[in-house]
């Protein structure tokens, strides 16, 4: 006869090996923070390209928090809380390299964090 503690230990072992997943709305702040983290990293890696884009599109503005995060190499995630989801989407999808570079990186980062999104 199998002991209840053996069953519980087996269930706990299975649960520990399964990766946790969370399904969130695309506008959820946790999703936005992952997106903004990828965005800030991409700006740091391709700063000249972003400067050129900004020069060609002077009406495309960024919240000051994004600029501060780009040049602050410490933990910047707390700086980025509170940026409206529609503003996050506008910034990220507004650059020509969104589909080729940002979208795959964001998908990868969300997946790595066990986050899956659903439409709002």
Swiss-Prot record:
The chain crosses the membrane at residues 7-24. Keywords: Membrane, Transmembrane, Transmembrane helix. GO terms for molecular function: structural constituent of cell wall. GO terms for cellular component: fungal-type cell wall; membrane. Coiled coil: none annotated. InterPro entries: SRP1_TIP1, Yeast_SRP1/TIP1_CWP. It is a single-pass membrane protein. PROSITE patterns: SRP1_TIP1 (PS00724). The keyword tRNA processing does not apply. One of its GO terms (biological process) is fungal-type cell wall organization. It is found in: Membrane. It comes from the Eukaryota. PANTHER family: CELL WALL PROTEIN CWP1-RELATED, SERIPAUPERIN. Belongs to the SRP1/TIP1 family. Seripauperin subfamily. This is Seripauperin-2. It comes from Saccharomyces cerevisiae (strain ATCC 204508 / S288c). The lineage of its organism: Eukaryota, Fungi, Dikarya, Ascomycota, Saccharomycotina. The gene is PAU2.
């Amino acid at each position: 006869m199998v002991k209840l503690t053996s069953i519980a230990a087996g269930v706990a072992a299975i649960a520990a090996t399964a990766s946790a997943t969370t399904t969130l709305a695309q506008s959820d702040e946790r999703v936005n923070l992952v997106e903004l983290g990828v965005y800030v990293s991409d700006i740091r890696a391709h700063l000249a390209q972003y400067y050129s884009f900004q020069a060609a599109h002077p009406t495309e503005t960024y919240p000051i928090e994004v600029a501060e995060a780009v040049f602050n190499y410490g933990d910047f995630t707390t700086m980025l809380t509170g940026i409206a989801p529609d503003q996050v989407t506008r910034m990220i999808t507004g650059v020509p390299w969104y589909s080729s570079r940002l979208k795959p990186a964001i998908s990868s980062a969300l997946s790595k964090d066990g986050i899956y999104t659903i439409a709002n």
